[in-house]
Amino acid sequence: METVFKAALRAPDHAWLKPSRFIQISGNGRNKLSQIFIKTAHELNKELTETQILKYTEAPFRAPMIIILISNYKEHPKVPPIEQIISTGCAGQNILLALNALGYGLSLIHI
C-alpha cells in the first residue's frame, strides 16, 4: 500500500497544501465503519427502513479493504477550497490507477 499512497500524493496540489487524507480500513475495522454508517444514517433520517439499515450494515463488507478519502482544506489567499477538494479527487484517481496497475480489482462507490 505504500506504493499506492505514494502515487496518491503525486496528485496536483497548488501551493503544496497537502489537503488529502486517507484512511485504510480492513478486517474488524469494517465492523466499526458499519456502526458509524448506521449511526450517521439514523442522525440524518430518524425513520430508516429495514432495507436501508441492512444496506448501511452490509456496505463495509462488500470489499476486503476500503480507502476513505478526506479533503482537509485550508484557508489560503490564492487556493480556494474547491481546488483543494479537486486535488483530493485527483489523489483518489491516482489510488485507483495504482491499484489497477498492481493487478487489484477495485471500484469507486458512495452510499
For each predicted feature, which ranges?
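N-terminal amphipathic, basic helical "cap/leader" segment at the start of enzyme domains
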Residues: 1-62
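Short pre-catalytic strand/loop immediately N-terminal to key active-site residues, enriched for Gly-Thr
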Residues: 79-86
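Active-site glycine-rich loop that binds ribose-phosphate moieties when present
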Residues: 87-91
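Short hydrophobic alpha-helices that are characteristic scaffold elements of the AMP-binding
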Residues: 100-101
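Residue-level detector of anion-binding/catalytic polar loops
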Residues: 105
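Conserved small/polar residues in nucleotide/adenosyl-binding loops
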Residues: 110-111
